[in-house]
């Protein structure tokens, strides 16, 4: 009996799209919020900025006689190298920085709290959110075209249960996807602003705090 339903395959795909749509848009929306909050957190993190200055001083001291001495800054990703510089007893530069901050700059220890939102943002990839949104927009256009074709084939299809269910949903989704597109563009601007604030130029490949 089901096989006699016109355009059954297209209708089933449309229903599946509708059931998955809400979860996907929620993931995108929550992910964008985390990235925006994380970007704003690292811009408004004075203790973290001061900590970077301390690390820069250490780096310049260690490289005082080399070509890297007297640097005005360093890439954020270079912080990972603090564990690679070791003394004879195995103590890393990270250990030394930690002890120095605790002893001489205890007021900077709260930088971790400043970056709590950025920690959440590390779990989100902006490129993944953009990809998910692009797939939703393509699917929405596809199912709208199918619905238009059904209506052109037979005017009675306009009043069919599938059309009455899908048409309002697709129209609403179209507007919502436009808003999500605007939100992604705004989030990307905020993210790039945070990268530039720390001297990290916008990178089309790097769209997360872990990059």
Model regions and ranges:
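Extended alpha-helical domain cores of large, multidomain eukaryotic proteins
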Residues: 1-211
